[in-house]
Amino acid sequence: MIPIDPWIILTLILGFGMAWAIGANDAANSMSTAVGAGAITPKQAVLIAGVLEFTGAYFFGKTVTETIRKGIIDPSKISDPNVLIYGSIAALLGATIWLIIATKYGLPVSTTHSIIGGIVGYGIIYGGIGIVNWDKMVRVVLSWVLSPIVGAIFAFLVFRALRRTVLQSEDPVKSAKRWSPFWIGLAFIVIGTMFYIKVLHGSSLYIGILKYGIPTGIIVFIITSMLLRVKFPNVDPYLGAEVIFRKVQVITSGYVALAHGANDVANAIGPVAAVYTIATMGLAGAKVPVPRWILALGGLGIAIGVATYGYRVMETVGKKITELTNTRGFTIDFSAATVVLIASWLGMPISTTHTVVGAVIGVGLARGVKAINKSVVKDIIISWFVTVPVAGIIAGIIFKVLLLIG
């Protein structure tokens, strides 16, 4: 039974609101390329994303989380548990308000950067700029720049290779039958490895590749090769090639949703778990346990967020940046997953949201600069750079008010 503590009740409500905002903005990215390419309808997308986001959050979300995300401020300098409670509430509200504003305008922003901004905001109000781990902040800023650039370059190169091996051949359907098992198998090596690292929270890249990635890729390669032996109807050869990648794109997008639920639910339930642990046990360590029912609350909030408001960001990423087809959508999912995997292995800071958007831009650039909606890209980039300061300012104001009335 949930203890009847006003701080716990308030934080649960705010945590659910943050999870809803994550679903409406960040989680919508997972299915945006599939919707933009016409692989599935928006209604199908929100249903699939909602189920997989909840599954990822509840069954694969970490049962131990950080009280202060990414060690962005020094927890040893916060000795008063009430400060951590007020700060958690302020960070949640600051991040949630900014996410709702960004989502209203269809701008895909990083939920991790939003909650980090909220934490920095209340941290500076409480302990001054010295409380912030500026080395970590530099890594966060680097991720703003590196993620979209690396995602764009990788997607550009992958799509050029895919276009040369399949779409520009004399018989695209025949080439797709020959080459798509290779491309799809390669994608599932990455997906299998990512499942081990991001969903099962494994620590060894080599174990992930050898035990999960390669076996998954080989199985999918064999199955795809067998399925493609069927004859395609006499249609436009380019459309025939796109059809081959359509169903696969739904699977790759679905994986992104599952992994997102497992990882980013911590942005909503981390502060909730911190307040719950302090209020019920008097503990205020750097890490706290996360009860399953809190994971369920976060997963439910994300799922409802996708279903009720996710269409705005889906439309921006899937339709407004550049025109997408199934091969382009597949390229984006494959490229984003690969870049995130490599970055995790190298210990580089990276934003999945920024990487996906960068990959969309990269695929568009493979067709020429004119294929990109530059005004939309400009608005997105501006929103990325104001995420941390805006969330921080809002959280700082809320924290100051809580200190005055607390």
UniProtKB/Swiss-Prot annotation:
The chain crosses the membrane at residues 2-22, 45-65, 83-103, 114-134, 140-160, 182-202, 207-227, 265-285, 288-308, 330-350, 385-405. It comes from the Archaea. Keywords: Cell membrane, Membrane, Phosphate transport, Transmembrane, Transmembrane helix, Transport. InterPro entries: Phos_transporter (IPR001204). The keyword Transmembrane helix applies. It is found in: Cell membrane. The keyword Oxidoreductase does not apply. GO terms for biological process: phosphate ion transmembrane transport. Pfam families: PHO4. One of its GO terms (cellular component) is plasma membrane. It is a multi-pass membrane protein. GO terms for molecular function: phosphate transmembrane transporter activity. Belongs to the inorganic phosphate transporter (PiT) (TC 2.A.20) family. Potential transporter for phosphate. This is Putative phosphate permease PH0640. It comes from Pyrococcus horikoshii (strain ATCC 700860 / DSM 12428 / JCM 9974 / NBRC 100139 / OT-3).
